[in-house]
A protein has these predicted regions:
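Classical Sec-dependent N-terminal signal peptides that target proteins to the secretory pathway
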Residues: 2-20
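Sequence-level detector for tyrosine residue identity
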Residues: 3, 19, 41, 66, ...
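Basic side chains
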Residues: 4-6, 87, 173
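Residues in flexible loops and secondary-structure boundaries
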Residues: 9, 16-17, 41, 116-119, ...
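N-terminal, active-site-proximal structural segment of metallo-dependent hydrolase catalytic domains
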Residues: 19-123, 137
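Feature marks short, surface-exposed loop/turn motifs that line or immediately flank catalytic pockets
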Residues: 32-34, 195-198
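A short, polar/proline- and glycine-enriched secondary-structure boundary/capping micro-motif
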Residues: 37, 168-169, 199
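Structured beta-strand-rich core segments of catalytic domains in phosphoester-bond hydrolases
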Residues: 105-107, 111-195
Length: 199
């Protein structure tokens, strides 16, 4: 299985207070990184082992999905431990291929929860990563933004986007803000992932 990602920026930031230190940043849409556990508070029905997809209730819910590829995924994808681990390992390999040991900061999109984020973090930990953060938001599919970092992460918070009634949508995803401390400098970082036209 091959998972594509885009590095929208792998930038080096230079700050006067950091002397000559640099910070490398990667942003990575991991495209539905789910664990294998059914969460009744999230729409994760596509990302379950096939043995949990056999009920008529599950099939009925899947058949309500408008987009054909998503509907088939909900019905037939066997999201088991082996499948999930293969995806995690592909993401891990892509991250550490950046530079010698991965970027200093990774901004991730489409992560289900802290459980699956923690699994990715422990794969990366031997490469100098020390912290990770994810805050649950109100996205109806249950996917969140997250950070994994070689620096300590402070003050995580979500900024919800408010629209006028003319442009209001059923849901939107908040912007995830956090702060890194590098030497004596506090640097704010932001992670945004906006809904597709299907929502």
């Amino acid at each position: 299985m091959i998972y594509k990602f885009k590095v929208f920026f792998a930038l080096i930031f230079l700050f006067p207070n950091l002397y000559s230190e640099t910070l490398s940043v990667m942003t990575f849409n991991v495209q539905n990184l789910f664990d294998t556990t059914n969460d009744p508070y999230k729409d994760d029905k596509a990302f379950l082992p096939i043995k949990e997809k056999l009920s008529e209730k599950h099939k009925k819910e899947c058949n309500k999905i408008y987009v054909k590829s998503w509907r088939l995924e909900c019905l037939y994808l066997d999201w088991n431990q082996k499948t999930k681990d293969a995806k995690l390992n592909n993401i891990f390999k892509n991250i550490i291929s950046f530079g010698e040991s991965g970027p200093d900061l990774i901004a991730l999109q489409e992560v289900e929860n802290n459980n699956i984020l923690r699994q990715l973090f422990f794969l990366l930990k031997p490469y100098g990563y020390i912290d990770y953060k994810l805050l649950e938001n109100n996205d109806k599919r249950g996917i969140d933004n997250a950070f994994i970092s070689k620096y300590k992460i402070f003050n995580p918070k979500l900024h919800y986007v408010k629209f006028s009634s003319k442009f209001q949508r059923n849901d939107t995803r908040p912007i995830f803000e956090a702060t890194l401390k590098i030497n004596e400098s506090m640097i704010r970082i932001y992670n945004a992932h906006f809904p597709s036209n299907y929502y």
